[in-house]
Amino acid sequence: MVTSEFKLFKFMLMGMSIAVALALSGPCRAFDIKGGVSKESGPFDLFKFGFKAYKNGQKEEAVEAYRYAAEKGHTGSRWALANMYADGDGVTQDDFEAFKIYSEIAQQGVEPGSEDTGFFVNALLSLANYYKHGIAGSPVRIDLSQARQLYFQVASTFGVPEAQFQLAQMMLAGEGGNASPQQAKKWLNQARKSGHPGAMAVFGNILFDEGQTARGLALMTAALDRCKPKDCGWMEALQEQAFSVANEADRRTAVSLSHSIATGSDD
């Protein structure tokens, strides 16, 4: 499953990337020469204009500016444009178009320490999601092996909790390769230490099934305090099932432990 943690990651990335742009940009005007920005402007100026236009609800102007900046090689604009296509935000939703742009970013690569690293990582994660689910009506078919490889790259090289969680899920299910429960537990444990609610829930359920009843139930309970509404349903089902078969002593211990987990005093 693709959780809202991924969308939050995209939102945070955009916020960090445009901090300088916001500081340097003035009021947004129409995309013309009088506004000081045209298609001949530099890629960073076009990116700044595109972001300001987007923020002001002028999404057609934002798309136009991002396109011109992307044609000039601006990675952040490519990424923003891909997200708009993926979400149907200001343009007709087109996952295949988003896939193609994310692929361009991934193929371009990044130098160590590059300011474009976040865009590159996000593109890899987006591509992994597309390969995992495929894109109907397009040449992009489900390729679980490729999805697993991309999740592994992002999880191991960049330590992104969402990638660690998705990789672990595939390892547990034996998707895209051999099942590897022990490796899956390792990745889930890393992701849950970063506060990923899905990883907390799944890792907790595994511990519960292995006999660590109170600790497993505590992690599943703590996950419910962190999950986004759209992701809470399956976590609630896991927690309620475990809670229903746990004895009273384990329930009480789990509640106490869940508070420690929530405050970060339990690792």
From Swiss-Prot:
BP GO annotations: polysaccharide biosynthetic process
Has the keyword DNA-binding been applied to this entry?
no
Q: Respond yes or no to whether keyword Signal is given for this record.
A: yes
Domain of life of the source: Bacteria
Matching entries from SMART domains are given as: SEL1
- Keyword annotations from UniProtKB, A to Z: Exopolysaccharide synthesis, Signal
Signal peptide region: 1-23
Q: Which Pfam families match?
A: Sel1
Q: Which InterPro entries match?
A: EPS_Regulator (IPR053479), Sel1-like (IPR006597), Sel1_AlgK (IPR050767), TPR-like_helical_dom_sf (IPR011990)
Q: Which PANTHER family match?
A: ERAD-ASSOCIATED E3 UBIQUITIN-PROTEIN LIGASE COMPONENT HRD3, SEL-1-LIKE PROTEIN
> Which NCBIfam families does this one have?
TransRegExoR (NF045484)
Tell me the function of this protein: Negatively modulates exopolysaccharide (EPS) biosynthesis.
Q: What is this protein called?
A: Exopolysaccharide production negative regulator
Q: Which organism is it from?
A: Rhizobium leguminosarum bv. viciae
Q: Which gene encodes it?
A: exoR
